[in-house]
């Protein structure tokens, strides 16, 4: 599934054999990306998508409005009892995500392989 070339969805398998839904973000993530980012997440059946990986490797630009969208997804996932991990952030955004408290809701990994080995 792909939404306006901003988000693609893929099923992966974690190290423990569990199914992980990977949402791969691409291009610019800002307030105009709401439908792509939040809408794609909200379209998932929460009961069958218990483990989510948010991959930012393809993101070229992410502003504070985009970070707010990520936080919205994380808050909804937390309420639904889903496990969320994040990978593919630049060193700068790893620092920003840590500073704004995103690590309270999702573990950060340098890449997909590291995330899958931990999930």
Language-model features: locations:
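Short acidic-hydrophobic, aromatic-tinged amphipathic segments that line or gate anion-handling sites
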Residues: 107-111
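STAS-typified acidic loop motif
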Residues: 2-39, 56
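Amphipathic alpha-helical interaction surfaces in cytosolic regulatory modules
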Residues: 28-106
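Short, ordered loop/turn segments at secondary-structure junctions
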Residues: 89, 112-113
